[in-house]
From Swiss-Prot:
Heterooctamer of 4 alpha and 4 beta chains. SUPFAM superfamilies: Phosphofructokinase (SSF53784). Its main location: cytoplasm. It comes from Candida albicans (Yeast). This is ATP-dependent 6-phosphofructokinase subunit alpha. NCBIfam families: 6PF1K_euk. Pathway: Carbohydrate degradation; glycolysis; D-glyceraldehyde 3-phosphate and glycerone phosphate from D-glucose: step 3/4. It is an enzyme of class 2 (transferase). ATP binds at G237, R300, C301, G330, D331, G332, S333. It catalyses: beta-D-fructose 6-phosphate + ATP = beta-D-fructose 1,6-bisphosphate + ADP + H(+). It is found in: Cytoplasm.
Length: 987
């Protein structure tokens, strides 16, 4: 007899080999009698001598290449039977909870093979151990087959198969199990009960729907510390981006080991309590990213303004164990939250004194933590460059004015558009820049009382004389003159009507709040929501309540009281007629935006023209792939040039056109309406100066070009480097040249932002939302979405964050099998308990150059192969749709800023400014004439092309060396569950 170490227990698969045809048939017959069922039969040579199996490859799947014959025998798992004795389907059994759930027991497959030559003989005899619940039936089968057998103990039968393998049968599952089963029914009943009990225990302590099974909350709670409970609420007017903020707070809170409660209906939910305070699970916020408004509701609550209301709010928070509050709202909501915190100790004391709560109940809640998120479409909060929802509202306004512009041009009408903003003119000013408005009225820079009507008439009439068929005037709802008299849209309408214009008045109203958040707001809200949770966990009772803001493109914490105080100071400055102070209290770029609007819309009357000797000939050329913002930048440069007296030449069809000498002098009407046009009206391609550098120099000299703007992506960057390197041979290349980055890939060294990237991301938001809706509607579907970006992972990382993708593959991350396996594990957990009711559709985002091996289709196939039928996969490739049709509002505004800043650089290098009028310091312009304009934080700066090319450019991969979007990758991994899965593996 073999030793116990030679025994093979709990067999799932075994291959038995012989070269004797009789023994092959005997072995097949032996195991068939024991209850194994034939599932596959293969023979290379049939009984008639024809090679049936050999001629049909589909019959050979899984068959060993050296087998003449094979039979596959399988013992199926034990299952329940119905009243007629028929097996019930596995999916109808009580223990079934998805195809990957634990089974009652595993099946066994025996492959019997016939070889043409004698196989190697085994050194030792092997023993196979089979589990059975019917030993008496096994004895009868062996007896009827005249097979000798014996018993070692009363519950183990030993026998030999025709190939002399020792097989044993036992009615215990393994050596550690003491239970001896006497019937299939007994085993099924007991095992079913054990599986259900184990599952119930697992679901009580951990359930992936809430991500508690991989949450590190046990780590924080296991050391005797009370688990932090955070409330999140939205208050005041709704704003796009509030839902992504709530999603971020909920999931980041769970990730950091906290319980998170949604306070429904704003402060009203805090006062009323009950069902309006709901503990949130991971899956509760699954679809929040693509929803506009706020799904947890908002309301203006009069009760909370009174101490009695705040007292009741404190009571409800303590009863639910909540001692931290993240409030997303405007300045009024955040002021109320900070007042609540300052009163908290006295409110707690009053609750004890009145007997509503005991000292023991309130002792863990002596201090309240408040963190503010600014959700406001007005962008009127000081201390932050932009508020959640502002860019979404700007996008809505821009879209509506574009629509209005179409009908206005058709009928040659004038439209007065009133936008929201209260005491803040940000929406009015930037929408004026983005839509090419003739005039804007904002409270921070009011016109002269008694004179503004004539000024308005003069500007609008002049533009009509230039050939414009429509007139657009944007009025902020808080617009005033310098004597604080309100300027209403009706008044403005009457002024235009007096000019004889067919005028209409449009108040956009709450349409500005509507719709889903744009890409920028989704990112802003998500990053700020995660930062809010970190602030809650890091604050002490002495820490002032912070407001989470964004300064220089970095998420920061600002004392809430200071921000509110400074915000109110703007209104006070306006009421005191100190308009310069009001302008200075706005974000850093507000004054520049106002200055640029005047340059291209008001000062085209010739009042700011330079003297004849300082007027320049400037050329602009588009290089590389089309990108949103090219035309908007060209329009801004053309209008600025006309207002300053310069000549602007548009190079047709890139550097190929410059080689031909195909340049056109642009007029005012040539660029009319270009602010809203995508693509390139003057033509663009990937041709470089090096194709005929001599001709490029000749035509620049021929047209006496004194400054060159190169608008485009990495080809524009390369073009400037080629021109700069040839300065010694062609002195004309000493003229100031500026690259204005414009590419969806955002891969130009020297800048963190390129024109067209925002439009691309907004396109991807719409595309991925639609794809995700399809995935959710069809249930259990995973889409692998391929996005552009070249070898830069910026677009993919941004897209993955703002669409809630489960995984993002970029060139920087290096896809490998280990990472794919981790994502497969995460997907399997996501779908493990899903029965189709959760609308559980999932996205994976892949950059087009993420891997030369793991293509989009291959990743989808690998996921599908490992899905075990729990989900299916599809691919989605938006392709050139990502370039967009109409530029986003943000791209239009940035096109004006970039291009006019570049023009000021060219003017400065050509000595157009006097000593006191210069726009740049000596350090900024230095000795370099060939530069790239870029954004670093919120600072626009110029960097020498030689420095960038030599030190910061990866020329081979056509991108910069700096990865400035790592924060998006880290936050995305927290919110998609990947970081949680890794923590589970560690703990």
């Amino acid at each position: 007899m073999p030793s116990s170490s030679d025994a093979i227990n709990r067999i799932s698969y075994i291959s038995l080999v012989t070269s004797d045809n009789d023994k092959f048939n005997q072995t097949f017959q032996f195991y068939s009698q024991l209850g194994f069922r034939l599932t596959k039969s293969f023979s290379k040579v049939s009984s008639y001598g024809s090679g049936l199996g050999a001629n049909h490859p589909e019959f050979q799947l899984g068959v060993s290449h050296d087998s003449l014959k094979e039979v596959w025998l399988e013992s199926y798992p034990l299952q329940n039977v119905d009243s007629n004795g028929n097996l019930r389907p596995w999916q109808e059994m009580e223990v079934y909870d998805g195809d990957n759930c634990e089974r009652l027991n595993e099946s066994t497959v025996i492959k019997v093979r016939l070889l043409g030559e004698t196989p190697l003989k085994s050194i030792s005899q092997k023993q196979f151990v089979f589990f059975t619940t019917q030993l008496n039936k096994i004895e009868k089968i062996l007896t009827d087959a005249n097979v000798k057998y014996g018993k070692v103990v009363d519950n183990v039968i030993l026998a030999e198969d025709p190939l002399n393998n020792i097989i044993s049968f036992s009615n215990t599952q393994n050596e550690l199990c003491k239970t001896r089963f006497q019937s299939p029914e007994e085993y099924v009943e007991k095992t079913t009960a054990e599986i259900l009990a184990k599952r119930k225990k697992s679901q009580l302590g951990s359930k992936f729907g809430s991500f508690e099974e991989i949450s590190p909350s046990e780590v924080g709670g296991g050391n005797g510390l009370r688990k932090k409970k955070i409330g999140v609420m939205t208050s005041g007017g709704d704003a796009p981006g509030m839902n992504p903020a709530v999603r971020a707070v909920v999931r980041a809170g769970i990730y950091y080991g906290c319980d998170v409660y949604a306070v429904y209906e704003g402060y009203e939910g805090l006062v009323k309590g009950g069902d309006l305070l709901k503990k949130m699970e991971w899956s509760d916020v699954r679809s929040y990213m693509s929803l506009g408004g706020t799904s947890i509701g908002t309301a203006r609550c009069k009760e909370f303004r009174e101490r009695a209301g705040r007292l009741q709010g404190a009571y409800n928070m303590i009863k639910n164990g909540i001692d931290a509050l993240v409030v997303c709202g405007g300045d009024g909501s955040l002021t109320g939250a900070d007042l609540f915190r300052s009163e908290w100790p006295s409110l707690v004391k009053e609750l004890v004194d009145t007997g509503k709560l005991t000292k023991e109940e309130v002792s863990p809640y002596e201090h309240l933590t408040i963190v503010g998120l600014v959700g406001s479409i007005d962008n009127d909060m000081s201390g932050t460059d932009v508020t959640i929802g502002a860019f979404s509202a700007l996008e809505r306004i821009t879209e509506m004015v574009d629509y209005i512009g179409a009908t206005a041009a058709s009928h040659s009408r004038a439209f007065v558009v009133e936008v929201m903003g209260r005491h803040c003119g940000w929406l009015a000013l930037l929408s004026g820049l983005a839509t090419g408005a003739d005039f804007v009225f904002i409270p921070e820079r009011p016109p002269k009382a008694g004179l503004w009507k004539e000024q308005l008439k003069e500007v609008c009439l002049r533009h009509r004389e230039y050939g414009r068929r429509k007139t657009t005037v944007i009025v902020a709802e808080g617009a005033i003159d310098d004597e604080l008299n309100p300027i209403t849209s009706e008044e403005v309408k009457q002024v235009l009507a007096d000019l004889g214009l067919d005028t209409r008045n449009t108040i956009l109203g709450h349409v500005q709040r509507g719709g889903t958040a744009v890409a920028f707001d989704r990112r802003l809200a998500t990053l700020q929501g995660v930062e809010a949770v970190k602030a809650v966990l890091e604050m002490t009772p002495d820490t002032p309540s912070p407001m989470i803001g964004i300064l220089k493109h970095k998420i920061v914490r600002i004392p809430l009281v200071d921000a509110v105080k400074q915000t109110k100071a703007v209104a006070e400055a306006i009421s005191n007629k100190d308009f310069d102070k009001a302008m200075s209290l706005r974000d850093n770029s507000f004054y520049d935006d106002y200055r640029y609007f005047r340059d291209i819309s008001i000062y085209d009357d010739g009042s700011k023209q330079l003297s004849e000797d300082k007027r320049l000939n400037i050329a602009i050329v588009h290089v590389g792939a089309a990108s949103a913002g090219l035309n908007a930048a060209t329009r801004a440069v053309a209008l600025y040039s006309l207002s300053r007296g310069h000549k602007l030449y548009a190079v047709q069809d890139g550097f190929a056109g410059l080689v031909k000498g195909d340049l056109k002098n642009l007029t005012w009407m040539d660029v009319e309406g270009w602010h809203s046009l995508g693509g390139s009206e003057i033509g663009t391609n990937r041709s470089l100066p090096s194709q005929n550098i001599g001709k490029v120099a000749y035509n620049l000299q021929k047209f006496n070009i004194q400054g060159l703007l190169i608008v485009g992506g990495f080809e524009a960057f390369t073009s400037l480097h080629e021109l700069s390197e040839q300065k010694a041979n062609y002195p004309i290349f000493e003229i100031p040249m500026v690259v204005v980055p414009a590419t969806v890939s955002n891969n130009v060294p020297g800048t963190e932002y390129s024109l067209g990237a925002d439009t691309c991301l907004n396109q991807l938001v719409s595309y991925c939302d639609a794809v995700q809706q399809s995935a959710s509607s069809t249930r259990r579907r995973v889409f692998v979405v391929e996005v552009q970006g070249g070898h830069s992972g910026y677009v993919a990382s941004y897209c993955g964050l703002i669409t809630g993708a489960l995984a993002t593959y970029t060139p920087e991350s290096n896809i490998n099998l280990r990472e794919l396996q981790g994502d497969i594990d995460l997907l399997q957990k996501v779908f493990a308990t899903d029965r189709g009711e959760d609308h559980n559709g999932t996205l994976i985002v892949r950059n087009e150059q993420a891997s030369a091996v793991y293509s989009t289709q291959l990743i989808a196939d690998i996921l599908k192969e490992n899905a075990n039928k729990r989900f299916e996969t599809r691919t989605a490739i938006p392709g050139h749709v990502q370039q967009g049709f109409t530029p986003s509002a943000n791209d239009r505004v940035m096109a004006v800023k970039f291009s006019l800043k570049a023009m000021e650089f060219i003017e400065t290098r050509n000595g157009c400014y006097g000593k006191h009028d210069r726009k740049f310091s000596d350090e900024e312009i230095s000795e370099h004439s060939q530069v790239v304009i870029g954004i670093h934080g919120d600072v626009v700066k110029f960097t020498c092309i030689k420095h960038l090319y030599d030190n910061e450019a990866n020329v081979a991969l056509r991108k910069g060396k700096t990865v400035h979007w790592t924060d998006m990758i880290d936050v995305a991994n927290i919110l998609n569950g990947k970081s949680l899965l890794k923590k589970q593996e560690r703990y």
